[in-house]
Every structure is written in structure tokens, then in C-alpha cells.
Amino acid sequence: LRPLMRVSLPGIARSGPGFAFRFSGETVPAWPGETLAAALTSAGHLALSTNGPDERRGVYCGMGACGECTVLVNGRSQRACMVAAAPDLVVEPMPRRAVPTPAAPTPAARHLACDLLVVGAGPAGLAAAAAAAGLSVIIIDERSKAGGQYFKQPGTGFALTPAALDGQYREGAALIGNVAASPAQLLAGRTAWSAQRDGERIVVETSGADGPARITAARLIIATGATEKPWPMPGWMLPGVMTTGAA
């Protein structure tokens, strides 16, 4: 049986035409709003990397935590579950021993400041931001949309009928809407990789597609959520074996 990682739920319909990208020289069909992991798995490509002569790896957690779905995207190492599929991408399996390539010069970090920095735009992070009345707030999240795993929102390539969606989606959409209507600034697709004290303030270094940013805040809330803790067993890392978060 071929596992499918494509959305098929009441109230969610595809919008826009499909497209294709290349994986190991083959054409892989994809749709707007889905990740490389979803498109590759649905096309039957379960093994995405190798960890030894006879040890292959594939999509496992589906939420960017384990790194098992790492592939080369236009020559760069990326997690397939965290990269949106796009036309004309060239994707290759991650080799066991990758050849390092020179990195492009990193631009200077832009500087941002706020009263409160929230790391994580899931339920807890959004609730904290919504409750911070009167403060300047910045929220960062490595995903392209707020909501986290619990309030995960459909991708940008879908037409939605809110009345037909479940209560969990509507609750999350309402919370996200409240934060969007507030003065809080949401920086999606941004990862925090360092935090240090500077006197009475905290300096957090972040990276994103639009370059690095250094955020200075008086207070910091870490609301990075939870990840699954699978139970090891024989065959648990075989390509096609996934946690519930991915499946």
C-alpha cells in the first residue's frame, strides 16, 4: 500500500493548478500548499536519505523535529517536511557523506526590539501574546503559519469553507485572528538559535529566509510545544514507518 499524505477533509478544497518538481531525475507531481515530504511520500518515494550501506531513512515525525527526511534541495540540505513544494525544484536524496560547499556570505542581522518575545506560535504562544495587552510583542515560529501542531492550519494552496471545518480548526483560527488583529508582530518561518542576557534584557539570534535578525526583549516566553516520544522497536526507522504526527 502506498501511504498518502494529502489533505482530504470536509471544508478543504484544492485551489490552483498542480505542478511538478524533480527527485532523483524523476518528475514528481505536487499541489500548492503541500510540503516536499507530502508530495514525495504520495508519489511512492519513501527512502529520502541513507545512514549506511543498507540503512535508508524517510519521513518519520513529519513536524521538523527528527531530521530523518533531510534531502538536498537545489544543493542545500533541507528537511522535506518543512519545505513547501514548488515548481522546478531539483531534489536529491541526502547522501550518507555530503560534500561541503561554500556558503554564501551571511548578511548583517537586522535589529528588532520589543517588550515581550514569544518563541512558538502554537496555542500557548498565541495565548500569551493575546494576553500581553499594552506591551510590544514579537512572536516567532519556524513554520510558515501560526497554530502549532494542535491548531495546525491548512497550507496556502487551499480554499476553505470555515463552516464545514471542525471546532478545533475554528478555535485555532479565532485565536490566530485575535493575535493578527492586535499590535503583536508575527515572524513566521524564523528559527531562534541563540539566547543570551545583555544586562536587564535578552538578546535572541534568529535566522529565516529573509536573513538573520537579532531581537532584543525585556521578557522572553518559550512556548515551543511538544513532540511525540515514539517507543523504539525493530523496524521503527524503516522508510514508510511514521509517527501519528506524520501519518
Show which residues each predicted segment covers.
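Fe-S ferredoxin-like electron-transfer domains
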Residues: R2-I12, G52, V59, E68-A131, ...
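Terminal leader/tail segments of proteins
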Residues: R2-P17, L36-A38, S42, A47-T50
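A short, compositionally biased
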Residues: I12-F19, M63-C69, Q196-I202
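Short, contiguous acidic and Ser/Thr-rich linear segments
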Residues: E26-E34
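A basic, amphipathic helix-loop patch mediating RNA/tRNA/ribosome contacts
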Residues: L36-N74
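Short helix/loop capping segments that flank catalytic or ligand/cofactor-binding pockets
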Residues: A39, G148, P230-P232
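FAD-binding core/adjacent interface of flavoenzyme oxidoreductases
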Residues: D54, R76-C114, E171-A247
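Beta1-alpha1 glycine-rich phosphate/pyrophosphate-binding loop at the start
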Residues: C114, A121-A174, N178
